[in-house]
UniProtKB/Swiss-Prot annotation:
Single GO molecular function: unfolded protein binding
Coiled coil: none
Gene name linked to the record: htpG
Name of this protein: Chaperone protein HtpG
InterPro entries: HATPase_C_sf, Heat_shock_protein_90_CS, HSP90_C, Hsp90_fam, Hsp90_N, Ribosomal_Su5_D2-typ_SF
Subunit structure: Homodimer.
Localization per Swiss-Prot or TrEMBL: Cytoplasm
Primary localization: cytoplasm
Region annotation (A) ranges: 1-348
Natural source organism: Alkalilimnicola ehrlichii (strain ATCC BAA-1101 / DSM 17681 / MLHE-1)
Keyword terms: ATP-binding, Chaperone, Cytoplasm, Nucleotide-binding, Stress response
Cellular component GO terms, alphabetical: cytoplasm
A Pfam family the protein falls into: HSP90
Record NCBIfam families: PRK05218.1
Amino acid sequence: MATDAHKETLEFQAEVQQLLHLMIHSLYSNKDIFLRELISNASDAIDKLRFQSLQDESLLEGEGDLRIRVSVDKDARTITVADNGIGMTRDEVAENLGTIARSGTKAFLDQLTGDQQKDAKLIGQFGVGFYSAFVVAEHVTVHTRKAGLGAEHGVRWSSDGKGAYTLENEEVAERGTRVVLTLPESQSEYLDDWRLKGIIRRYSDHIDVPIQMPAQAEDKDEPEDEAEKAEAAETWETVNNTNALWMRPKSEISDDDYKAFYKHVAHDFDDPMVWLHNHVEGRQSYTSLLYIPKNPPFDLYEREPAHGIKLYVRRVFIMEDTEKLMPRYLRFVRGLVDSDDLPLNVSRELLQHNPLLDKIRSASVKRILDRLEKMAKNEPEQYAEFYGNFGKVLKEGVAEDFANRERIAKLLRFSTTQDENETPDVSLDDYIARMKEGQEAIYYVTAESFNAARNSPHLEVFRKKGVEVLLLPDPVDEWVITHLNEYDGKPLKSVAKGGLDLGELEDQAEKKAAEEATESHKDLLEKLKGALEDKVSEVRVSTRLTDSPACLVVGEYDFGMGMQRLLKAAGHAMPQGKPALEINIDHPIVQRMDTGLDDARFSDWAAVLYDQALLTEGGQLEDPAAFVKRVNALLTEQARAGEAKSNAARGD
């Protein structure tokens, strides 16, 4: 294999420069995090070597004693973090250290507020990894060699974090990666061994890799000659607890231990909300340690997040994959599963259809849902906090997990017309418990915002009758709710779809009046249909409206208008269906249209009637300028009529 030996100086990706600047100025109170991140990277490199060496033992190069070493040189003002893991090639160094290989980078930068404390917390959630070294270092050098390659394939990367880095080949005798941080005078506190040991024990104590530092012989004098110094330098002591936390009995693990391990595995500053630790023995043996975070991970709304549940086989890290161990609607869960029954050389292809993994996944989902049900029942305030952070993701389970659909639906929370609280806090059980006598269905309305939902004209008759309606303002709500046809034997019905059927709540006198109005205003309905024939499927007298002049209603089995717009924007072909226009026959605007307007004016009034109904649905007008022109014309007409009336009253 040829070696690319030339030296090159390259510019950082633009987002990297911005991120480095933000970190240096925002992580002022959390600088310790740099060591946690570098150790976690080293641990990942060792995990990768362990896994790959199962297929190719030669990668160990005769050295199977895997470890991470942290050392300080006070004279040179350096901290070195070295591992004998998988190492990197030149291309991998350029890819991993010159760019941020994460799709959410731009979104992350957009979320920053300028508030140092808030931004520091967000940066910690994002997981800045290697770049956190520049929070304390004025210069960083990386020496690395990929396992299985010769010493001549070593790579040296160097940068001061100010916009550019150099990349060149060098001789590297040992496999692995060595990161050398040169510290300025202002960061001298980190040149103390005890300070670094404290950070390691706080953040990385439970890493399943020995973290070693030079032994401190407190009962001996300082070495005087070079031989004694060399001997002392070769003596290393392990400073972390290398026993895997999850393998210990729960009775021996303190809450602080669980919290510290969570911060390591999730790269989070905050404590978790809850955790579930289970040892399963029998036909299948495995251990799971699952955490529900207090705050949403940065990649929560990515359907294919980069981080999730880690899979270990007999304490050997195999892979990190959310969906194989946890469904996507629970992608906020962090933690691990360690199985005794999977083969160590298991392939990713085999994992896709592994019955044991399916059983572990099902059991893990059950435990999470059990814990959420318990929280919702016994700790409603904590559950409200959880739902505020993760409810939008949890509700996806209604559409994705048929086996647990009813359980997930029970955990959902909604805003309703009863108190119009924008914070969803009403369960379906709450709704059913206060349904009116004779009410047969659970009613809901979807919209593109909370205000649009609560002000929907479709709610008018329900408010008049005192019937509670669920308000669903999230874009995903309609997709979710179409998969929940009923709950506890009660059908779910949209107030904006199909014909209005209130069952026993329907006022027969009102229904009869609407039928009579349809007959007596037949000419108006036909004329409106003719004026709007390219936009509506029919025009009918409404039994929904009490205050508004008109509303649009789609078919009972059609997508709502908001969902149609979302699907169309996403590039999906939509059927060319048209909504129905329902009119309030008692409204002054509609009555005015029934008084012999000429064709041109009637056409303008009809267009305005349709456009305002479309706007209340969150729709976009095809020709806003034409709409404004028509409205201005109508207002001018009314103003002149009012002026003429005033003049007549004065006798002018």
